[in-house]
């Protein structure tokens, strides 16, 4: 798979570039950005274009507006933060392809940046509309996609727009290339032993990824709510824990396939249980076989943390996707944070995928220790499932 990098494009001073970023950052109720990692990770591409004296028009979405202007999804806070990080003005458009954006784009000087308003304020974005994509393409003689987090979606600014650029005028940004390289190396040629740590609430969300990962890994650790479907499949009583009964057969098939392939398959051996799903719940520690009726498992227990820590100890490659428990509640955060510390301590390559997992790593204070933290939740999961992502396929040099 050959994809251009920005360094392969022939920029001249004054070249106009349409850059698709993923600035879908979390905001608090006052509209302040609570985590600017996605903005910071786009800086290498933006700075490279600035060094080449390009005129840069940036597009991004934020949240899920209903295809019309909605102040709470405006990119104004992003423009402010980006300007602060770059230490230069970022011009903010009032619309996407309307008169304000077009006028401001026409007046851009070399080394200036225009940020369009949220592309999802136009309903044609999510429909992958070719007419809208053509209008966007008129902002730049070059196109760069640096938005891994939306590259699994065939949207106008990600997929349709590439039809208006030949191979010499389109590329993946440095962040997107980094994401692709990490995940492809991980799946095609990992340094062994390769351990996957898979958590999160539901098996259904991770089923395809598990099936695709099994032949590639040496060991697999299952935690989070999805573990209870596997525990129930083994005949354990799981009380009121989250279980997808319709996937019990699939869980049995996955365990049988792991055995056939010689992949060691680990489930929690003890559980932190609660009498209700709430901060003020009563809490007990029990073995995985002894969850009483009326109680639900909300985190892995200390023995599971020790066991998983030993499994991770000699790993040369670790992929972590999905928390071990309801880490948003303090009482049920210990398992996730301790596994985060165990992974951070390991000497191998440590790749973290998925939004919740990235949040957990940051809250555990381990983000500096990880080799790579992906910016895409759904996109990284689809890569792990072995799917081709529309935004990446559209950049391939045919």
From Swiss-Prot:
Keywords per UniProt: ATP-binding, Cytoplasm, Glycolysis, Kinase, Nucleotide-binding, Transferase
The EC number on file is: 2.7.2.3
Q: Report the pathway entry.
A: Carbohydrate degradation; glycolysis; pyruvate from D-glyceraldehyde 3-phosphate: step 2/5
Tree of life domain: Bacteria
Write out the GO cellular component annotations. Answer: cytosol
Please state where this protein is localized. Cytoplasm
UniProt cross-references to InterPro entries, sorted A to Z = Phosphoglycerate_kinase, Phosphoglycerate_kinase_N, Phosphoglycerate_kinase_sf
Primary site of residence: cytoplasm
Query: Example GO biological process term?
Result: glycolytic process
Does this entry carry the keyword Glycosyltransferase?
no
- Per the record, a Pfam family? PGK
Catalytic activity from the UniProt record = (2R)-3-phosphoglycerate + ATP = (2R)-3-phospho-glyceroyl phosphate + ADP
The residues that the entry says bind substrate are 22-24, 38, 61-64, 120, 153
Locate the residues binding ATP. Answer: 206, 297, 328, 354-357
Coiled-coil blocks: none
Q: What class of enzyme is it?
A: transferase
An example molecular function term from Gene Ontology annotations: phosphoglycerate kinase activity
HAMAP family from the UniProt entry: Phosphoglyc_kinase (MF_00145)
Self-association state and partner proteins as the record states: Monomer.
- State the similarity comment: Belongs to the phosphoglycerate kinase family.
Which protein is depicted? Answer: Phosphoglycerate kinase
Q: What is the native source organism of this protein?
A: Nautilia profundicola (strain ATCC BAA-1463 / DSM 18972 / AmH)
Q: What is the lineage of its organism?
A: Bacteria, Pseudomonadati, Campylobacterota, Epsilonproteobacteria, Nautiliales
């Amino acid at each position: 798979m050959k994809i251009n990098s920005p360094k392969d494009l022939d920029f001249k001073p004054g070249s106009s570039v349409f850059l698709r970023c993923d600035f879908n950052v979390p905001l608090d109720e006052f509209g302040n950005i609570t985590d600017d990692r996605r903005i910071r990770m786009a800086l290498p591409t933006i700075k490279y274009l600035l060094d080449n004296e390009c005129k840069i028009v940036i597009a991004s979405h934020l949240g899920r507006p209903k295809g019309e202007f909605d102040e709470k999804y405006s990119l104004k806070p992003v423009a402010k933060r980006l300007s602060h990080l770059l230490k230069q003005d970022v011009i903010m458009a009032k619309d996407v392809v309307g008169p304000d954006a077009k006028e401001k784009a026409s007046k851009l000087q070399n080394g200036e940046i225009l940020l369009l308003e949220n592309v999802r304020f136009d309903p044609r974005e999510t429909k992958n509309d070719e007419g809208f994509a053509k209008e966007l393409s008129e902002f730049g003689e070059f196109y760069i996609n640096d938005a891994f987090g939306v590259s699994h979606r065939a949207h106008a600014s990600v997929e349709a727009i590439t039809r208006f650029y030949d191979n010499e005028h389109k590329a993946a940004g440095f962040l997107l290339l980094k994401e692709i390289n990490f995940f492809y190396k991980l799946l095609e040629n990992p340094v062994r032993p390769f351990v996957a740590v898979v958590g999160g609430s539901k098996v259904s969300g991770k089923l395809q990824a598990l099936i695709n990962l099994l032949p590639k890994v040496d060991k697999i650790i299952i935690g989070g709510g999805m573990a209870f479907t596997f525990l129930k499949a083994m005949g354990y009583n799981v009380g009121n824990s989250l279980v997808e009964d319709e996937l019990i057969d699939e869980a049995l098939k996955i365990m049988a396939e792991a055995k056939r392939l010689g992949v060691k398959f680990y489930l929690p051996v003890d559980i932190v249980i609660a009498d209700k799903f709430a901060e003020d719940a009563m809490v007990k520690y029990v073995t995985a076989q002894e969850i009483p009726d009326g109680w639900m498992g909300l985190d892995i227990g200390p023995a599971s943390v020790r066991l998983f820590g030993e499994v991770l100890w000699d790993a040369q490659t670790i992929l972590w996707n999905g928390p071990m428990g309801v880490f948003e509640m303090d009482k049920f955060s210990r398992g996730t944070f301790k596994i985060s510390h165990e992974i951070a301590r390991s000497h191998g390559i440590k790749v973290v995928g998925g939004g919740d997992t990235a949040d957990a790593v940051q809250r555990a204070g381990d983000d500096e220790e990880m080799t790579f933290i992906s910016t895409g939740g759904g996109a990284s999961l689809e890569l792990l499932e072995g799917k081709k992502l529309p935004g990446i396929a559209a950049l391939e040099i045919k």
